Amino acid sequence: MIGIDITSTDRIKKMYEKFGDKFYEKFLNPDEIELIKKPETAAGFWAAKEAASKAIGTGIGGSCSFHDIKIKKDALGAPKIKYKKEIRKKFGIKKSHLTITHDAGFAIAVVVNVLKKK
């Protein structure tokens, strides 16, 4: 399954300016917040989590929340994504891949989930 999302960096920046850390806490865990050094990164993480929820066919909501999805960076700074165990099991996810790009004030993320054979 594939999910994609595009997010305005300016929108994320304005939300942070208005609500501060409370805004980040709505969609990021403490480890993810530590990785945020600029609005572009936060926008990329937002887009990544939205794309991940779309890749399981639900969107963000009752079946999958922002906090059911975790983003890390590898040694080279590339983003990595992981769903909570309950989500992986419920949707039969074997492995997940994430890419994030930024251009013209937008963050775009694509998530590809490899599913377990039935």
Curated annotation (Swiss-Prot):
> What InterPro entries would the database entry show?
4-PPantetheinyl_Trfase_dom (IPR008278), 4-PPantetheinyl_Trfase_dom_sf (IPR037143), ACPS (IPR002582), Ppantetheine-prot_Trfase_dom (IPR004568)
Q: What keywords are assigned to this protein?
A: Cytoplasm, Fatty acid biosynthesis, Fatty acid metabolism, Lipid biosynthesis, Lipid metabolism, Magnesium, Metal-binding, Transferase
Q: Which cofactor does it need?
A: Mg(2+)
Cite the Gene3D superfamilies for this sequence.
4'-phosphopantetheinyl transferase domain
Listed under catalytic activity are:
apo-[ACP] + CoA = holo-[ACP] + adenosine 3',5'-bisphosphate + H(+)
| One Pfam family in the UniProt entry | ACPS
GO BP terms: fatty acid biosynthetic process
Family indicated by similarity: Belongs to the P-Pant transferase superfamily. AcpS family.
* Record protein name field: Holo-[acyl-carrier-protein] synthase
The gene for this chain is acpS
